[in-house]
Amino acid sequence: MSNRRKSNKLKEKETDWQERVVQIRRVTKVVKGGKKLSFRAILIIGNEKGEVGVGVGKASDVIGAVKKAVSDGKKKIVSVPITKDSSIPHIVKGRSGAAKVIMRPSAPGSGVIAGGSVRTILELAGVKNILAKQLGSNNPLNNARAATDALLKLKTFSQVAQDRGITS
């Protein structure tokens, strides 16, 4: 009986997550017999409660690539501290390859001002008011990874105070 309840709770937790496909691209591998075609899917998964992840999957069909991307995204979940204004605590920069992302907290009601895969990441993380700028690259995968790198660097005010040895 108790096993059934646990599985129901797990299913409820699973339904909170949303998935958005950023890019599906047909890629080729040159082999002795010619070219082997496969598909690469870039997918972002988040629960709009401060958790988000980027997944990449490759398979011979699109559905298989998306499934692999979902499982990869669940392994790479990042926790995001969100303020009471549904923004981020401070300005932060992230980098992946040539892609750079700058994120700044914004006033309530301004919305998510960002482009491409960075916008998708911020929306699925649950951030409502933010300014973000992509620099250096148009590659959606590197921009998504740069955004998650920036979100990893975020700290709450209490975490910063604790790091500095200040107690209030």
From Swiss-Prot:
Complex and partners: Part of the 30S ribosomal subunit. Contacts protein S4.
Name of this protein: Small ribosomal subunit protein uS5c
Function: With S4 and S12 plays an important role in translational accuracy.
Domain S5 DRBM: 17-80
Transmembrane segments: none
Family: Belongs to the universal ribosomal protein uS5 family.
GO cellular component, one term: small ribosomal subunit
GO biological process: translation
Protein's organism: Rhodomonas salina (Cryptomonas salina)
GO molecular function, one term: structural constituent of ribosome
Entry text on domains: The N-terminal domain interacts with the head of the 30S subunit; the C-terminal domain interacts with the body and contacts protein S4. The interaction surface between S4 and S5 is involved in control of translational fidelity.
Record has rRNA-binding as a keyword: yes
Keywords of the record: Chloroplast, Plastid, Ribonucleoprotein, Ribosomal protein, RNA-binding, rRNA-binding
Pfam families with a match to the protein in the record: Ribosomal_S5, Ribosomal_S5_C
Subcellular localization(s) per the UniProt record: Plastid, Chloroplast
Keyword NAD recorded: no
